[in-house]
Regions:
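Mid-protein regulatory/catalytic core that forms ligand/cofactor-binding pockets
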Residues: 104-200
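Short alpha-helical segments that sit at the start of domains
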Residues: 1-13, 73
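C-terminal regulatory/effector modules of DNA-binding transcriptional regulators
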Residues: 167-291
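Short amphipathic alpha-helical interaction segments
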Residues: 36-47
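Amphipathic alpha-helical dimerization/coiled-coil segments
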Residues: 80-122
Length: 291
């Protein structure tokens, strides 16, 4: 497990919902039981700060970390997919995006951001996604100051191409077979926990926190390589749908006990972390507040 990636998940899933800042010692405490030692934590947050993901504030000998503005925006794009309830309809439309003047130093970050928006390369220099909205593209172009360096077009499928042919094209270019195997592994890893909770077994706050962090980390890792495709373009019994339903249900089960751990064991400059932001309860279509 990559320490840097896990720490990004910690900030995106947890810290962003509880004040946006955390003490370095609490970061180490959060991931210690998951095999990330203190030395690796310090090295990882230093590198994440250097790469522009995190910013640091120091008070005496203590360091407190939070997302940078750009780091927070990047994760927010991911969050729109991670915590989606699914079920979006599709009317056969496609968005095509062709960078015409992309500076070399922006290339990797821009393409990663395109991936989170659901775009994939379909030919040299052309990216496509089914459906989608213009606002997310406009925000991305504004962020990278590329409004004059990118061509955006819309296309539509017709009856000249059958759904079977479209599914074959998507399966090949989106590499669905590899993704489906990853989703199966995710389901195999977390379904036993869901079954145990359904039978009335209670998760201790620290265990719920660790399970929640691992769930979102593994789910995010797969989504980074997946594109949110409509059901019309997916294979029958697509395991990505099963994985999303499992993640949604399990996250709801773990929300209350994991939040208990977060607010009693982790600290920032003001002391214990504050209550969850209101939009935390909108994740996965709605999470019930603890009584």
């Amino acid at each position: 497990m990559r320490a840097k990636s896990l720490i990004i998940t910690l900030f995106g899933d947890v810290i962003s919902q509880h004040g946006g800042e955390i003490w370095l010692g609490s970061i180490a405490k959060s991931v210690d039981a998951l095999g990330i030692n203190d030395r690796l934590v310090r090295t990882s947050v230093f590198r994440l700060a250097k790469e522009g993901w995190l910013e640091v504030e120091r008070e005496g000998r203590k360091s407190f970390y939070g997302f940078t503005r750009s780091g927070g925006k990047e994760y927010q794009r991911a969050a729109q997919r991670i915590y989606s309830a699914g079920g979006d309809s599709w009317r056969g439309g496609w968005q095509l995006l062709m960078p015409t003047n992309l500076p070399e130093h922006l290339r990797d970050d821009f393409r990663r951001s395109l991936t989170w928006l659901g775009f994939r390369p379909i030919s040299n220099g052309t990216f496509a996604r089914p459906g989608g909205d213009e606002e997310s593209i406009r925000d991305l172009l504004d962020e990278f100051d590329l409004s004059s360096g990118v061509v955006v077009m819309e296309a539509k499928t017709t009856a000249l191409t059958t759904s079977k042919e479209w599914r074959a094209i998507v399966s090949e270019h989106w590499q669905l077979s590899h993704l489906e195997e990853d989703y199966r592994q995710l389901i195999g890893l977390f379904r036993p926990l869901k079954k145990a909770l359904d039978k009335g077994q209670l998760a201790a706050p620290v265990e719920a926190f660790q399970a929640r962090l691992l769930l979102i980390h593994e789910y995010r890792r797969i989504l980074l390589r997946d594109t949110p495709l409509p059901n019309d373009l997916l294979p029958n019994r697509w395991q990505g749908t099963v994985a999303r339903q499992l993640a949604q249900a399990l996250y709801r089960d773990l929300a209350a006990p994991s939040t208990n751990y977060i607010q009693t064991e982790l600290v920032n400059r003001q002391g214990r972390l504050p209550e969850s932001e209101h939009y935390f309860y909108e994740r996965f279509g709605g999470i019930a507040k603890a009584p």
